[in-house]
Amino acid sequence: MAEDEPPGASLKPLVFRVDETTPEVVQSVLLERGWSKFDQQEQNMEDWNLYWRTSSFRMAEHVNVKPWQCLNHHPGTTRLTRKDLLAKHLQHMERLYGAPLYEFLPPTFVMPHDYSKFVAEYFKEKQVLDAKLSYWICKPAELSRGRGIIIFSDIKNLIFADTCIIQKYICNPLLVGRYKCDLRVYVCVTGFKPLTIYIYQEGLVRF
C-alpha cells in the first residue's frame, strides 16, 4: 500500500462496459491501458466506469448514470450525427444568419418529406441545363462509411426505403494531385456548457 493511500483503500482498475456493436479496437485499446471489461454475470449492474457503444443512449440512461460513470454519447447528439437532422439544423441556421455564410451547403432535401420540393427542383434544373447531365447524390440518414449511397442523374433511378437526404452532387470538388480528398479529425467533447472540445493531434487525410 502506498504511503498516501487511505487505510482500507485499494486501487481497482477502471471498468468499461460494451455491447455487440462496440468495435474491437476500442476494447483492445482500453485493455492495453489497464482497464477491465465489465462482466454482467460476475459484477453488479452499476460496477462500471465507462459504457461505450455505437448507438445512442435513451434519456433515462443519461439521467440514471452514477457520478463515477460516463457514457460515450452526450444526450441529443443525434441531432448532429443523423444526416437528415443535421441538414434541417443547417437550413435553419441559414435562414437565421443568411445564405452567404452557408454557401458551402449544396441544395439538400430530406426524403420523403421534401420529395415534392426535390422533384420540382430536379425538373427546373433539367429544363435549364437542357441536354447536359446533372447529378444528385442520395445518402441514407443513419448509415455511415459510404453504405447505401447512390449517385444518379435520372430521377427514375432514385430508390429509397428509409429516411435519406438528397443533395446536388458537387462535380468540381477540391482535388489534390487530381484525387478527391477529405480530412478526418478526432475530437473528444467533454461538455456543452461551456462547450469543451479536445482535438487529437493526429488525423487522417483520405484520397
Q: Predicted segment positions?
A:
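Catalytic core of tubulin tyrosine ligase-like
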Residues: K117, L129-F207
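Conserved N-proximal alpha/beta basic substrate-recognition cap immediately N-terminal to
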Residues: A2-Y135, E142-S144, N157
